[in-house]
From Swiss-Prot:
The lineage of its organism: Bacteria, Bacillati, Bacillota, Bacilli, Lactobacillales. Residues 250-256, 274-278 are annotated as: RNA binding. GO terms for biological process: queuosine biosynthetic process; tRNA wobble guanine modification; tRNA-guanine transglycosylation. This is Queuine tRNA-ribosyltransferase. Transmembrane segments: none annotated. Substrate binds at residues 95-99, 149, 192, 219. InterPro entries: ArchSynthase1/Queuine_TRR, TGT, TGT-like_sf, tRNA_ribo_trans-like. The gene is tgt.
Amino acid sequence: MEPAIKYRLIKKEKHTGARLGEIVTPHGTFKTPMFMPVGTQASVKTMAPEDLKEMGAGIILSNTYHLWLRPGEDIVEKAGGLHKFMNWDRGVLTDSGGFQVFSLAKLRDISEEGVAFKSHLNGEKLFLSPEKAIHVENALGADIMMSFDECPPFFESYDYVKKSVERTSRWAERGLIAHQNPATQGLFGIVQGAGFEDLRRQSARDLVGMDFPGYSIGGLSVGESKGEMNRVLDFTTPMLPEDKPRYLMGVGSPDALIDGVIRGVDMFDCVLPTRIARNGTTMTSQGRLVVKNAKYSEDFRPLDPKCDCYVCKNYTRAYIRHLIKADETFGIHLTSYHNLYFLINLMHQVQDAIEQDNLLEFREAFFEEYGYNENNGRNF
């Protein structure tokens, strides 16, 4: 049986671990490395599907936990799956719900069977197991699905993380058995292990032995420093097969994207660009710009003079500041669109740099202009 997800390696960058590739899904092909906008509840906040296509998004992420609780996977399935439900004909990836259960849910109780917890919406008692998570993801119909895993805190004890990794491997195997649609939905395994190299190796070895069509790196961007994250990536990505995609979960700051690519990561997602946009904060080639600040009230330049998105072509900082201060939703739409475009376009620039074997030079120039080399509060 042909796998639902195929990865083709196009080129390796000469001086780093970066890879140029493409991923084929049942709903189209996209080039990697790439950034995925997050549509938590089957919608990227304030964005129409047409906006996402216009900015070049090839795949978006939705959250299994939220859609399971509301509207329910049965309703999405009756609609014909997420693609039809939200009128999106490109790729969709769903997480397993595990991260939300471990971070949002109250009074969770972890056992070998799964996790008992209370809904963050109404306090209802619920239970999520590897089989249930896969059942929900099968019903949602995403092109790429995630295994149900435990995401332990980064600074948890070695003994706890070891037990957690072993349980995550057992859960991954149970999820594979429960998976009903391997020909149309690709299920990824998630490598855990916090900051411990031997536990990351154990996790990777277990999962690679199960022959998933792709692998996620979980348990990062959860409070550790960027240096710690890069240290873990340095030893984790080489443990993963070269002929499968590698996905770093929950990472979306420009520096972390570039540094992740340098270490061999192909896919990223994060709520960061839309979350900060709702607070009037934007990413520009010159670093962070908080457009809601008073100093922009008479600034009639675009958010980023170097950006060619439709927001920067048509609207000024002063106008966008006015909208944000007046609580107009259109202002949040404009900042969200720009931030998503900025990251998707950044990944296109990174792809070009890999093609030209000058990714390290690109990183140096980008970091200098963005302000990452100074402690000036402009960066993320």
